[in-house]
Amino acid sequence: MRRIVLLLLLSVVAIMAAEAKPNKKVTIKVGSYNLMTSDSRVKHIAKNADMSHQRYWCHSAQAIAAQVSDLDCDIIGIQEVCDSIWGLTGDKGFRKLMEDAGNTQYKWILYPNGSKGNLSYDVAIGYKSEVFTELESGIYWLAGIFDRSEALPTAPKGSKRPCVWAKLQHNETGKILYFFSAHFVVPGISKEGNAFNAENCITYAEKLIGSRKVPSIIVGDFNAAKGAPGFDVVEGSGRWHDVFYILKDEGMLDESETKKGTCNAKNEQSISGWRPDHITIDGNLTAESFKTVRDKYPTTDGTEHYPSDHFPIVAELKF
């Protein structure tokens, strides 16, 4: 009798353990958002009389903070981070503005990308601490010298771009996930550099991840649409595929969504069909939904604007 009871107890424990193990499928929401550096805002406003002064960072910071909160991602990659956006200078850091508004659920990962320890078109990752636990994180550079902010002598022009990564553990299932936030050089500066960034991004990502059985996501502003060097290198790896095109090819996107680009003009007067922003996943994850978020938010004078010259993108993934 005791043996039977013991066997029953062991069976119950085994079932409970199985339910808590990585076999359980859950849905996570991930995103990517290029915030448009404060320097870039100043430069473009000075050159463009039609560009509203409400797009200065000091006027748009609260809109960015509200939008990032509303996206409600479990993990999000951020691009074009500078000192004022991060809150190292001034009082308009979007993280503090989010916390002041009551959103304290995110932890943030950033490493200075400048050779002097400054933030210059840097990249970051935010994740909900109730959903994930950070195990490891770091930064590497995409100009051929991975461990410092330098470029190979043969590296194409402008290719000294960063990628921040995190090894995260899902709190409910215990599953491990690698997440990368990257920003490639604009092809207008160097097509070769755009491809070089992509090649270095995936080469080092593969080294970090190791086993192909470990789920991984690369997001960011690739400055490349489908058919351009940076995109084609990532897609051509055979390991990471763009969620937008996965769902589009399967007929799972609304027609209106298939026509959306991820950028707006600097003056907000026209919306581009260009798609430089991407969420790419490996075969360990399943794409369930994708959206380019084109919402306007009130700035300091109460008028509504697109908070950045990029639109955030979000995807739901089965993990």
Predicted regions, residues:
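Positively charged n-region of N-terminal signal peptides that target proteins for export
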Residues: 1-4
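Hydrophobic h-region of N-terminal signal peptides that target proteins for export
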Residues: 10-18
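N-terminal, active-site-proximal structural segment of metallo-dependent hydrolase catalytic domains
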Residues: 19-100, 105-107, 115-120, 177, ...
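Active-site beta-strand/loop signature of hydrolases that rely on acidic residues for catalysis
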Residues: 30-35, 64-90, 126, 166, ...
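Solvent-exposed loop/turn segments at secondary-structure junctions
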Residues: 35-39, 81-85, 113-117, 130-132, ...
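Structured beta-strand-rich core segments of catalytic domains in phosphoester-bond hydrolases
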Residues: 81-176, 292-293
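Metal-dependent phosphoester/phosphodiester hydrolase catalytic core
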Residues: 133, 157-160, 167, 171-199, ...
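Metal-dependent phosphoester-hydrolase catalytic domains
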Residues: 206-217, 224-319
